[in-house]
């Protein structure tokens, strides 16, 4: 099962006593800040969690899997995530399906 933005908003509602609307708006605002920073080309560092970085990928040769035709894969910018040490340590110590 995946954790969704709606799940996070529900946790804020139940644990912090926010209204559902406030909780939803806070979650949306949080992710919008991350989106905007990445659009500006900035790195996003969340202490104890990890870093979101932008990486430039060069054009490279590719192949259409159906036809086998050679096609170029265009250059693009991609978002990468590198988990921090604290997150890695916590995930390593969790049993599957906990």
Curated annotation (Swiss-Prot):
Locate the region Disordered: 52-73
Q: Which SUPFAM superfamilies match?
A: IHF-like DNA-binding proteins
- What is the official name of this protein in its record? Integration host factor subunit alpha
One Pfam family matching this protein: Bac_DNA_binding
InterPro entries the UniProt entry points to: Hist_DNA-bd (IPR000119), Histone-like_DNA-bd_CS (IPR020816), IHF-like_DNA-bd_dom_sf (IPR010992), IHF_alpha (IPR005684)
Matching entries from PROSITE patterns are given as: HISTONE_LIKE
Spell out the molecular function terms from Gene Ontology. Answer: DNA binding; structural constituent of chromatin
> What protein family is recorded?
Belongs to the bacterial histone-like protein family.
| CC annotations in GO | cytosol
UniProt xrefs under HAMAP family: IHF_alpha
Record's keyword terms, sorted: DNA recombination, DNA-binding, Transcription, Transcription regulation, Translation regulation
* Biological role: This protein is one of the two subunits of integration host factor, a specific DNA-binding protein that functions in genetic recombination as well as in transcriptional and translational control.
Q: How is this protein organized at the quaternary level?
A: Heterodimer of an alpha and a beta chain.
Task: Check the record and name the NCBIfam families matching this protein.
Answer: himA, PRK00285.1
A GO biological-process term: regulation of translation
The protein's matches in SMART domains, at most eight in alphabetical order, are given as: BHL
Q: What is the species of this protein?
A: Aeromonas hydrophila subsp. hydrophila (strain ATCC 7966 / DSM 30187 / BCRC 13018 / CCUG 14551 / JCM 1027 / KCTC 2358 / NCIMB 9240 / NCTC 8049)
